[in-house]
Amino acid sequence: MSAADTAEDLPEQFRIRRDKRARLLAQGRDPYPVAVPRTHTLAEVRAAHPDLPIDTATEDIVGVAGRVIFARNSGKLCFATLQDGDGTQLQVMISLDKVGQAALDAWKADVDLGDIVYVHGAVISSRRGELSVLADCWRIAAKSLRPLPVAHKEMSEESRVRQRYVDLIVRPEARAVARLRIAVVRAIRTALQRRGFLEVETPVLQTLAGGAAARPFATHSNALDIDLYLRIAPELFLKRCIVGGFDKVFELNRVFRNEGADSTHSPEFSMLETYQTYGTYDDSAVVTRELIQEVADEAIGTRQLPLPDGSVYDIDGEWATIQMYPSLSVALGEEITPQTTVDRLRGIADSLGLEKDPAIHDNRGFGHGKLIEELWERTVGKSLSAPTFVKDFPVQTTPLTRQHRSIPGVTEKWDLYLRGIELATGYSELSDPVVQRERFADQARAAAAGDDEAMVLDEDFLAALEYGMPPCTGTGMGIDRLLMSLTGLSIRETVLFPIVRPHSN
């Protein structure tokens, strides 16, 4: 609120509440005290008195605090429902014979819906059997100048995203998703640590943006006078850890990609990457499946995931595995191999009605591998529903991945799809520094041809490989997308505070 805002510019409710704030200050009653002597949360009061008989008084004296979400004032007795941060609600009663006329009148005059209040008094059960705190004193802990949304009018999705703090107050579903995310992250760390993985931290600011095919956010260090990039993946530094002697490592942190935002993509998101020595992509697929199943057990309590439409999504047991080229061949009705030409692939795309698709007909250096993945996504990928690993990708699109042991032209890579969402990826990691340099050179040629997602050559990473990296497998999984898979929600609903375009004013 700027000094230029006059009373006439403000909504009526805002003006009324601001006037109440001013009156409280004039009376020497701070509407924003430094602290209040809360002794119990609302949940603790409820847990201590689960079956209190109707119209019963106890000698349990408590100090509670919460946000007023309902209030009813009468002559000598006022009722209010307080809500705690976890959504627990508890009734408080302000009675003339307990607090006196002045305190009762002050409650009626000063307290609005949305205010946070402190109430001290005895735990009782009302005549209707409602567990309550009968106040002997009270005070405002934080005056709300903005009224809460009308209870019977649901907030729009845009409003929920822009004002998540209000969404958390008024919508139990928002609180549940926020707490589920916390439980999921905790369960991931526990499951990995139980398997002997060590959590490490690698740079977020990097001199080169490597480890993934994505456009980075660029910035500049004034102290060093060099350009830097927000990381698009932690992969290359985690592999340096493997070179340095770590056996199993993981990082769960934020990554940034300067690309589109939609129902499954966000420019800033949480990524889990894991690396373990002496394993292959088959081993990491098993670990990933077990990890997700254990997270569901711990955070949700079931592997039969309840979805918003009332259906159930089953992630128990073994998951399906398909190969990219054979599954694409079946979908197209003709054999597609690593030797299929670019012209033929574009001809197939035209026959599917994709002749104007910019991802198919482009001038950015996309070749066989990119076209294979685009065609697969538009045919096989869009039909996947059950948990599925798709394996063995084109060499051209997987420059950090080991060549397949028995199939020429493909690499040992899998992608995991849950509920049709691309959730995770895993490799048998490329450890030959000579081949890795050749792959980086191929990426440089693609970049020169216009591919702005091509990887850059990282000489320090190559130097690390030249010291010798043991055989290893790595995985990457988006935490936001994992929440999407577990809940059926959009990516913006799974992120506590997603990026939104500022209002024009």
UniProtKB/Swiss-Prot annotation:
One of its GO terms (biological process) is lysyl-tRNA aminoacylation. PROSITE patterns: AA_TRNA_LIGASE_II (PS50862). SUPFAM superfamilies: Class II aaRS and biotin synthetases, Nucleic acid-binding proteins. Pfam families: tRNA-synt_2, tRNA_anti-codon. Its cofactor is Mg(2+). InterPro entries: Aa-tRNA-synt_II, aa-tRNA-synth_II, aa-tRNA-synth_II/BPL/LPL, Lys-tRNA-ligase_II, Lys-tRNA-ligase_II_N, Lys-tRNA-synth_II_C, NA-bd_OB-fold, NA-bd_OB_tRNA. Its EC number is 6.1.1.6. Its main location: cytoplasm. Binds 3 Mg(2+) ions per subunit. Mg(2+) 1 binds at residues 415, 422. Mg(2+) 2 binds at residue 422. GO terms for molecular function: ATP binding; lysine-tRNA ligase activity; magnesium ion binding; tRNA binding. Homodimer. There are two lysyl-tRNA ligases in M.tuberculosis. This is Lysine--tRNA ligase 1. It comes from Mycobacterium tuberculosis (strain ATCC 25618 / H37Rv).
